Structures are given as structure tokens and as C-alpha cells.
Amino acid sequence: MADQNDVDYEHLEYVDYKDTEFLEQFINNQGKILPRRVTGVPARVQRQITKAIKRARHLALMPYVSESVR
């Protein structure tokens, strides 16, 4: 789960799909994308994060499922 003190999400302009360490904060131990009510980010940023995670998965930068589920 993401800590709201790490990044100012209101002024975040671009979520980079290549920054997998940042994106892993928004994925649970099963590999699912955490909902906005859990992460506490604004709706616009949640949409960007979701899109970036899906792009990273498609390009094989991130797994679709975690190692523990396989």
C-alpha cells in the first residue's frame, strides 16, 4: 500500500510505466491492482497508475501474477 507522504499525488503529472518500483506500491501480494479507496490517490492519478501497470505488464516489465500465486 502506498504511503501518502511519499509523493504529492495532486501535482503528479505523469506516471511512468517503466518505473516498476513505484508501480509495485499499488499492487497487492496476488498481483492485483489496489483500489483507490485503499491507496488514497485522486481518481485522475489512479487512472494513470492503472494504465501504467497494464502497459508494464504488456511489455513484460511486471508480472501479471505474483510469484506466490504461480
UniProtKB/Swiss-Prot annotation:
The keyword Lipid biosynthesis does not apply. GO terms for biological process: translation. One of its GO terms (molecular function) is structural constituent of ribosome. GO terms for cellular component: ribonucleoprotein complex; ribosome. The keyword Ribonucleoprotein applies. Keywords: Ribonucleoprotein, Ribosomal protein, RNA-binding, rRNA-binding. Belongs to the bacterial ribosomal protein bS18 family. Binds as a heterodimer with protein bS6 to the central domain of the 16S rRNA, where it helps stabilize the platform of the 30S subunit. Part of the 30S ribosomal subunit. Forms a tight heterodimer with protein bS6. HAMAP family: Ribosomal_bS18 (MF_00270). This is Small ribosomal subunit protein bS18. It comes from Salinibacter ruber (strain DSM 13855 / M31). The lineage of its organism: Bacteria, Pseudomonadati, Rhodothermota, Rhodothermia, Rhodothermales.
